[in-house]
Amino acid sequence: MHPYPTCTLVTPTYNWPQALELLLLSVTQQTVLPNEVIIADDGSRDDTRKLIQQFQETFPVPLIHVWHEDIKNRKPAIMNKAIAKAKYEYIVEIDGDIIMNRYFIEDHLTYAKEGQYLYGSRVNIQESLLPELFETKKTQFGFFSKGIKKRTRTL
């Protein structure tokens, strides 16, 4: 067993609960879970808060919602507030529209070293496929899955 560092996952969100839902579902499917997840909310409407509250009822780790009022784009400010609330030694930061591969957190923690910054690339999903993904709640994709653009970034 690998001695993983403790970990906080931080992600921003703003008025796109459908994308946040897929992100949170992908967290629940991780082979190694973060110790907590913090959502940095840049002033989203009430539907985002309600979605987070629904997930909090059954989420496998603490799910913390850090919100501030919507006064134009203040993503850096809300991210700083969210990171300040992190309780664990290692922070993984992802964008709010990311659907993580189930090994994402495990891979991050496997290669975590003090003084080292890890980053990765992402593939894009064709916009025309988003309604289907939001309907089916699909969160796992193969290299040849339909609608994946820039798939060679995964190599």
Map each language-model feature to its residues.
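Conserved donor NDP-sugar-binding/catalytic core segment of glycosyltransferases
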Residues: Y103-T136
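Short, acidic, metal-binding catalytic loop of nucleotide-sugar glycosyltransferases
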Residues: L25-P34
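Conserved short acidic donor-positioning loop in nucleotide-sugar-dependent glycosyltransferases
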Residues: N15, V27, D42-G43, D70
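Glycine-rich, basic loop-to-helix element that forms the pyrophosphate-binding segment
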Residues: E69-A86, Y103
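Cell-envelope/extracellular polymer assembly enzymes that use nucleotide-activated donors
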Residues: P5-T8, E36
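A conserved acidic beta->alpha catalytic loop
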Residues: D41-K50, K72
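Short aromatic/hydrophobic "clamp" motif used to bind/position activated sugar donors
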Residues: I91
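Short beta-strand/loop segment that forms part of the nucleotide-sugar
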Residues: P34-G43, I64-H68
